[in-house]
């Protein structure tokens, strides 16, 4: 049985789709004085991090877009709280980030820093390497 990959079958020069987003740090490009663009894996990682940190009704004209994990941060951390956070993160990423195929989500309590560490492992479409995004959720009053 022969092994074929996409580049040997597809004769086009560009077989992989690139993803571009604006850099939300609004850094200025030194030559064009425009906002710098982030590409490929960095764009998807930024999008995943933003979706996890977004609350419902936070984005104008999109009240349905959000994760809602900040509501669970004021509860006592139990194994069920970790499961609820994992489910909310998985739900928002499946619904609003089609570029990422989730492989695992790890939720760990950080009692010393009063936060919860979340690690999302996923594959970007058309790329073979796994990608990991780690963020810390903290209680903000």
Where are these regions (language model features)?
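Short secondary-structure junctions
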Residues: 94-102
